[in-house]
C-alpha cells in the first residue's frame, strides 16, 4: 500500500503543477493581448497587471487605458471562474485517488 500512496502523491503533485501551469499560460495570453493592443509599454508591466488582475488582487498601481478597461474586468472574472473550477477539479482528483487507494487496501 506504500506504493499506492506514493503514486497518489505523485499524481496529486502533477495535477497541482499542471493546473498552475495552465493558469500561468492564461496569464501570459492576457499579457500578450495587452501588448498587442499597446495597452502597456513592455512585457513586465503587462505580466504584472495580468497576474494581479487574474488573481483579483488589482493593486491599482498599473492600470489599463480608459478605452480598454473592460478587458481587465473580463480577465478578473475569467480568473475567478477558472481558479474556482481548478479548485473543484483538483479536489475531485484527490477524492477519486483516495477512493482508489481505499479500494486497493480492501483487496
Regions found by a protein language model. Name each.
Residues 20-49:
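Outer-pore turret/helix-boundary of cation channels
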Residues 2-14, 40, 63-71:
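Juxtamembrane/transmembrane-helix boundary motifs in multi-pass membrane proteins
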Residues 45-101:
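Pore domain of cation channels
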Residues 3, 11, 25, 32, ...:
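A generic structural signal for ordered alpha-helices
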Residues 1-20, 83-107:
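Cytoplasmic (intracellular) domains, linkers, and terminal tails of multi-pass ion channels
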Residues 16-24, 74-81:
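Hydrophobic alpha-helical transmembrane segments of multi-pass membrane proteins
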